[in-house]
């Protein structure tokens, strides 16, 4: 795009449009990005603040026959963060929160008798240029890079020549497992139960609580949006 989005030249052109619109008695609607959907700051958000962009829920799984000793490091990096660790016995679908078995970012668990699915529930960062709509700091940063830049330069036109702004399609845009780490803590605060006992329901049938667990997680996500 020329001139580059949000560059000095870009705003110079925008000011020309505003002056012409004012002289002709016309209105101008500000669109807050350069493409669909809104929330990328023209790609700058991903380049400059990747932790504030879209995140996905991922599950890493190991099947282990007990009794056995299982050890595995947790995901700890700028792009991947472990939110919960669980184990489900495949025959009974009994679920165990393995948080207490984590030491120094490593899971070390003595697996009981049976066949167990050991699951690490991770949040992967920076999977898409779009802002993480569910993280207030991320949204504030995106606003400061876009709306605030218009307001600093063209505030006198707002409420007059500029009487509308257009924000295009808040949503998940085909990434159904869009996530944010705050959901884990919010789940535990609201329901008083470890999220690790219910994350498996997002991937498996865990029994009678499956539907309720899914609704609980997705309700929280919808509220944050």
For the regions a protein language model found, what residue spans apply to each?
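N-terminal-proximal low-complexity accessory segments that begin disordered
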Residues: 1-3
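Mature extracytoplasmic enzyme cores
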Residues: 5-224
């Amino acid at each position: 795009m020329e001139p580059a989005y949000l560059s000095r030249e870009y705003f110079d052109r925008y000011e020309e449009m505003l002056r012409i619109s004012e002289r002709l008695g016309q209105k101008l609607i500000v669109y807050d990005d350069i493409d669909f959907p809104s929330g990328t700051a023209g790609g700058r958000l991903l380049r400059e603040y990747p932790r504030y962009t879209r995140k996905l829920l991922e599950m890493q799984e190991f099947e282990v026959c007990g009794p056995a000793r299982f050890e595995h490091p947790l995901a700890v990096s700028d792009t991947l963060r472990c939110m919960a660790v669980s184990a489900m016995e495949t025959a009974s679908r009994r679920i165990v929160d393995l948080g207490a078995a984590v030491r120094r970012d490593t899971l070390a668990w003595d697996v009981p008798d049976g066949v167990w699915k050991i699951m690490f529930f991770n949040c992967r960062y920076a999977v898409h240029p779009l802002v993480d709509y569910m993280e207030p700091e991320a949204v504030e940063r995106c606003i400061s890079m876009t709306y605030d830049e218009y307001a600093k330069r063209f505030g006198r036109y707002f409420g007059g020549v500029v009487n509308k702004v257009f924000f295009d399609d808040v949503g998940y845009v085909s990434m159904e497992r869009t996530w944010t780490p705050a959901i884990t803590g919010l789940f535990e605060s609201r329901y008083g139960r470890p999220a690790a006992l219910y994350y498996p329901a997002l991937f498996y049938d865990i029994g009678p609580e499956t539907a309720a667990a899914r609704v609980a997680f997705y309700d929280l996500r919808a509220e944050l949006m």
